[in-house]
Amino acid sequence: MKNIVLGGGCFWCVEAVFERLKGVIDTEVGYSGGNPNPSYESVCNGDGNIEVVKINYDEKQIPLLEILTLFFKIHDPTSIDKQGADIGIQYRSIIFYENEEDKILAQNFIEKQQKIFSKKIVTQISRLQTYYKAENYHQHYFMNHPDQGYCQAVIAPKLQKIQSD
């Protein structure tokens, strides 16, 4: 089993996509990249942390390249600290890797994707230094609250788009 930690806007949205994939063992939303021991409130107030999803996956069933390809389909990797109406440094596009092999794969992936995108890709690639699990009420949010307003307005259409692709 391997882990990759991705930040690409609201962590509810990113988790909702990846927790449904064959080969993904588990997902968990959390925070990374900023001050120690963050809370949702501190992250929203700009403590430097990013909303992220830790994806535990079986690389024999779903390779990292497939995960990154889907990641680039579900968020705008050319947008600086913003995804849709969600604005702030906590929504930046970032790939946190745990080993050099994944770093190189991510770098090569972005290099190839840049040839497709007309705007500059701003997705950062960084070694995972710290990760803090988010509060329990954030875990598997869409799965637990599919009828909530944000879920219906933002997440459900994203899932429908992915399923139709």
UniProtKB/Swiss-Prot annotation:
Keywords: Oxidoreductase. GO terms for biological process: protein modification process. It holds the Pfam family PMSR. It is an enzyme of class 1 (oxidoreductase). One of its GO terms (molecular function) is L-methionine:thioredoxin-disulfide S-oxidoreductase activity. The keyword RNA-binding does not apply. Its EC number is 1.8.4.11. Has an important function as a repair enzyme for proteins that have been inactivated by oxidation. Catalyzes the reversible oxidation-reduction of methionine sulfoxide in proteins to methionine. NCBIfam families: msrA. The gene is msrA. It catalyses: L-methionyl-[protein] + [thioredoxin]-disulfide + H2O = L-methionyl-(S)-S-oxide-[protein] + [thioredoxin]-dithiol; [thioredoxin]-disulfide + L-methionine + H2O = L-methionine (S)-S-oxide + [thioredoxin]-dithiol. This is Peptide methionine sulfoxide reductase MsrA. Disulfide bonds: none annotated. It comes from the Bacteria. The active site is at C10. Belongs to the MsrA Met sulfoxide reductase family.
